[in-house]
Regions:
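Short, well-structured N-terminal submotif of metal-dependent ribonuclease cores
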Residues: 1-65, 80-87, 166
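Acidic, PIN/NYN-like endoribonuclease modules and their adjacent C-terminal/linker elements
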Residues: 2-26, 55, 102, 129-166
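Short beta-strand scaffold positions
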Residues: 29, 64-65, 103, 123-126, ...
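Alpha-helix capping/helix-boundary segments
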Residues: 33-34, 69, 108, 128, ...
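Acidic catalytic patch
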Residues: 67-69, 90-118
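A short acidic, often aromatic-flanked loop/helix-cap motif at beta-alpha or helix-coil junctions
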Residues: 71, 108-109, 162-166
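Phosphate- and divalent-cation-binding pockets in alpha/beta enzyme and binding domains
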Residues: 72, 111, 148-149
Length: 166
């Protein structure tokens, strides 16, 4: 079936030029970064997260995340009772409209497991690394442990605090 993504709540086939040969900058984001877009209380590096949020309206950047991101964001908000259900609905809609949400396939799952076992990280974190590798796009994270354990991988992992759009 080739490379596909869910965008605007519809499955689309991603043309190879969009993934491989585009001059557009591509990034994979994990939930630790995206969460900061919607919840500011006791969070750090909000300015850097806001830069990435502003990329949503840019034609120069493509932001990707595995479908796992939606589950992690919803789970993080589960205990934030001050965030009303209507707000959660709009967050989910915005994420599907603005980020290319990539369905995890067998290849990503297999690669994620290898990374999880090799780096001693969660399988969930391994999914972000595997997607980053598959798309040949840097992974941006605010997770210090993930960064520390994955920074020496051949594909780039960028700590949010170190992110620069240059």
């Amino acid at each position: 079936m080739g490379k596909t993504a869910v965008f605007n709540e519809e499955r689309i086939k991603l043309p190879d030029f969009l993934i491989g040969e585009s001059k557009v900058r591509k990034y994979v984001l994990d939930a630790s970064v995206v969460f900061k877009w919607y919840y500011k209380k006791n969070e750090v590096d909000l300015c850097k997260a806001d830069i990435l949020y502003n990329f949503l309206d840019s034609k120069e950047y493509l932001l990707f995340a595995p479908d796992l991101l939606i589950y992690e964001i919803l789970n993080a908000f589960r205990l934030k009772e001050e965030i009303k259900n209507e707000i959660i609905d709009s967050i989910v809609s915005e994420l599907y409209d603005a980020i290319f949400i990539i369905e995890t396939d067998k290849g990503i799952l297999r690669d994620a497991f290898v990374h999880a076992r090799t780096l001693n990280i969660s399988f969930y974190d391994g999914i972000y690394i595997a997607l980053s590798k598959k798309l040949d796009a840097p992974l941006i994270t605010a997770d210090k442990k993930l960064y520390r354990l994955g920074k020496d991988l051949p594909h780039r992992i960028i700590m949010l605090s170190d992110f620069s759009e240059k």
